[in-house]
Each structure stands twice: as C-alpha cells, then as structure tokens.
C-alpha cells in the first residue's frame, strides 16, 4: 500500500525534528499523527508538547509564534487548516516576506506555513470552505510557495521548505497516493524545480495540484486521438524563475500552451505563466482554463 500524502508530510517533519532538536511545530485541532501499513507517526507523543504545541484556535497567534521563533533562529512550522489560511495573511505579507529585506539580508527567517488547501466540496461550511489561496500567497514578495501533487513530492518539498532560510508557504491539497514510491529515508525536492510528468511534441499543458490527476487523464485521452501532449507540473509557484525555463523550452517545441488552474480566472497563477511565455515565445498560442470569477458553490448539485 503506498504512503498517503499526509503520512509522507509527517514523515518529513518527523525526520527533520529528529535532525534538528530546535524545530518546533504549532498546530490547532488537527492532531499531527498518521498511520501507514503497520507503522504510525505521533509527533506529539514522540517529541512532547514543548516542541509540538497544541494551540488555541487562533491562526494569527500560531503564525505569529512561528514567525517570532524564526526571528531568533529557531525554525518553526505553523499548521493552519483549510478554512483559516486567509487569517494570517497580513503577518505573512507585512512581516514574513519583508523582514529579511528590512535587515539588509543580515537575518534569516526559517519558517514554514503549512497551509491546508481544501478543494470545492459540499459540507457544513459550503462556500466558506473554498480556501485555495495559493495565488494570493504567490504574489507576496519575499515568500516561497510550493504545491506538491503526490506524496513523493510532498515529503521532499516539506524537507526543502524546513531547511530553507526563507519563509515558505507549503500548500497542502488532498491529492491521491500516486506517483513515485516514497522512500523511508530523507530526501529533498528542490524548490523552483518543475517536473515534466509526460513528454510530448504537439501541445504543452501546465497545471498543478489539485488538477494533476485530471490533467494526466486528459493527456491519455489526447494520446488516443493522436495528440502528443507534454505535461509540466510547476511544483513551485513562487519564485517562478527556476520553473519558467522548462516551460518556455517546451512551448518553443510545441508552439501551444494550455494551462489548468483551480483558482479564479482573473489573476490566477497560470495567468502569470502565460504572460511570461508570451514575452519569451512570440507567435505561440495560449489558452487558460480556470474557475469563473465568482464565489465557489457549496451545493452538491453544483459541484
């Protein structure tokens, strides 16, 4: 049985907490524990409440605490559930992303905002559960934003985020247990390095979690129609400097770019990708698929 994304993330944090005796996790009501096969992870049980802090439901305090610890050189992770990822936005915008620049590069702020991102689905919160804010965080200068689409990338990107000296927003969408097998030992997936999921020559498709499973199925359907699609998963949404060369070279080869984005059509992440490709590849054709500029529905009949 493959490891789940949640288990892979906790395995990454467990390994890093063993490696770094100062690393601290703040969380509220989602207990940091998971099981796989005949094994289990319970971070609070292993490391105690001094380093795995069960907090009141106050997302600003949680992120502020992690940010404050990082300011004195203690790496920290703040885990925020899906319906509350917008609450600490001001702290990330006004402090986390700016403090390195305000100190002239003399200080580092090694913190991770582990942000649950909920897909649109019907339950008690309805529209209020639509909390995919990766586009909002990606446009904040000074932050790095990563978004894994499988358990392997989730573990490797979490380790990279923890070891990074700058604040990283780790966007955690519920994704299927697919992709490469997740090793038990630690490894890093570099921030800023995209993944070419499928090679092709007729069209370039760019999309990220939680769209990747649907895109993979679409690539197979296109293959049945004689169309060879190249599928690129950015994995990093900010900064894009390391991601764009792979996408640009692909579009130079195919001449066509289709992007798929879970966010709203206007100002979505893929709009920025298209803009950069348009500047670099004259004559290429583009199409953007994204959610309409409207509040997401909460009724089951509309999902």
Please name every model-derived segment:
Residues 1-167, 171, ...:
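Thiamine diphosphate
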């Amino acid at each position: 049985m493959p490891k789940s994304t949640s288990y892979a993330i906790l395995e990454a944090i467990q390994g890093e907490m063993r490696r770094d005796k100062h690393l601290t996790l703040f969380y509220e009501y989602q207990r940091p524990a998971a099981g796989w096969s005949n094994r289990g992870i319970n971070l609070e049980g292993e490391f105690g409440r001094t380093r795995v802090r069960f907090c009141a439901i106050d997302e600003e305090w949680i992120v502020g605490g992690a940010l404050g610890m990082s300011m004195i050189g203690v790496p920290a992770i703040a885990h925020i559930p899906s319906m509350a990822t917008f609450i600490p936005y001001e702290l990330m915008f006004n402090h986390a992303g700016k403090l390195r620049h305000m100190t002239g590069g003399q200080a580092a702020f090694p913190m991770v905002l582990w942000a649950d991102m909920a897909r649109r689905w019907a339950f008690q919160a309805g529209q209020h559960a639509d909390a995919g804010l990766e586009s909002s965080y990606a446009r904040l200068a000074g932050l790095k934003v990563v978004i894994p689409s499988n358990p392997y990338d989730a573990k490797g990107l979490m380790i990279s985020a923890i070891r990074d000296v700058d604040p990283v927003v780790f966007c955690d969408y519920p994704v299927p247990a697919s992709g490469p097998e997740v090793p038990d030992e630690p490894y890093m997936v570099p921030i800023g390095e995209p993944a070419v999921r499928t090679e092709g020559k007729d069209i370039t498709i760019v999309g990220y979690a939680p769209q990747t499973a649907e895109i993979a199925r679409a690539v197979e359907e296109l293959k049945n129609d004689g169309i060879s699609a190249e599928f690129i998963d950015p994995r990093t949404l900010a900064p894009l400097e390391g991601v764009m060369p792979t996408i640009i070279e692909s579009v130079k080869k195919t001449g066509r770019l289709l992007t798929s984005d879970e966010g709203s059509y206007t100002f979505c992440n893929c709009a920025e990708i298209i803009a950069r490709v348009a500047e670099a590849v004259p004559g290429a054709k583009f199409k953007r698929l994204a959610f309409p500029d409207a509040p997401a529905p909460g009724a089951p009949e509309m999902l």
